[in-house]
């Protein structure tokens, strides 16, 4: 199955290409592209197994996020990775925001990437496995209260203001903040903000558990 790498950085292209070839993907099956038009065409032509996208490639175009969203929806069997364009922040974790969409950064560990792509590589070797690690995939969700609170938090409200508006104790607000940080796997507010914004841009938003 083909692989697509959408990144304007030659160093990253080289690194990801080498990584994929070491894992057994032939170079002729790796497409290097720069923009969304190419991504759309290649996805339609090749039906890729994995697409690796640098957020920098689409954040500067006005309708780019909507186009990326449509591509992801149109290819449910393709595993998409979006590497956040976030500077001076070290984030080694990853988040499944949809069954076929992972948000991470270029600081992700090779061992983590290995585990996320393990099913894909097994499939390359014609082993009988489900696509990716989808049998174990559970996109992260927030409770309705956490979702409401996160919106206020990201809008600049502090704990006391959130406490007053939601009519809950400040201690409860702090507890919800802790849960959100745990689910997004970081204590860094800048990373949390970036993850939320990116998820809103390329999907319908973070899943909310309505129960």
Curated annotation (Swiss-Prot):
Instruction: Please tell me whether the keyword DNA-binding is annotated for this protein.
Output: yes
Share an example GO biological-process annotation for this protein. Answer: regulation of DNA-templated transcription
| Gene Ontology MF terms in the entry | DNA binding
The entry's function note states: Component of the Rcs signaling system, which controls transcription of numerous genes. Binds to DNA to regulate expression of genes.
Provide the HTH luxR-type domain boundaries.
135-200
Checking InterPro entries in the record gives: RcsA, Sig_transdc_resp-reg_C-effctor, Tscrpt_reg_LuxR_C, WH-like_DNA-bd_sf
Family, according to the entry, reads as follows: Belongs to the RcsA family.
Q: Which Pfam families match?
A: GerE (PF00196)
Q: Identify the DNA-binding region of this protein by residue numbers.
A: 159-178
Q: What is the protein named?
A: Transcriptional regulatory protein RcsA
UniProt keyword terms in alphabetical order = DNA-binding, Sensory transduction, Transcription, Transcription regulation
The domain of life for this entry's organism is Bacteria
What is the originating organism of this protein? Erwinia amylovora
Q: Which PROSITE patterns match?
A: HTH_LUXR_1 (PS00622), HTH_LUXR_2 (PS50043)
């Amino acid at each position: 199955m083909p692989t697509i790498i959408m990144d304007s950085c030659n160093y990253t292209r080289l690194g990801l290409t080498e990584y994929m070839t070491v894992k057994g993907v032939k170079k002729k099956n790796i497409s290097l592209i720069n923009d969304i038009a190419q991504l759309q065409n290649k996805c339609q032509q090749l039906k890729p197994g994995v697409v690796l996208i640098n957020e920098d490639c689409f954040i500067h175009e006005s309708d780019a996020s909507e186009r990326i969203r449509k591509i992801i929806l149109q290819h449910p069997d393709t595993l998409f990775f979006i590497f956040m364009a976030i500077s001076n922040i070290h984030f080694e974790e990853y988040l499944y925001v949809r069954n076929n969409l992972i948000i991470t950064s270029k600081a992700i560990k090779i061992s983590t990437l290995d585990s996320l792509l393990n099913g894909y590589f097994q499939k390359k070797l014609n082993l009988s496995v489900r696509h990716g690690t989808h049998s174990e995939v559970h996109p992260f969700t927030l409770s309705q209260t956490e979702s409401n609170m996160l919106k206020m938090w990201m809008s600049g409200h502090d704990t006391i203001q959130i406490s007053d508006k939601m009519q809950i104790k400040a201690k409860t607000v702090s507890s919800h903040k802790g849960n959100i940080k745990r689910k997004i796997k970081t204590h860094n507010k800048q990373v949390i903000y970036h993850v939320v914004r990116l998820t809103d841009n390329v999907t319908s938003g973070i899943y909310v558990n309505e129960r």
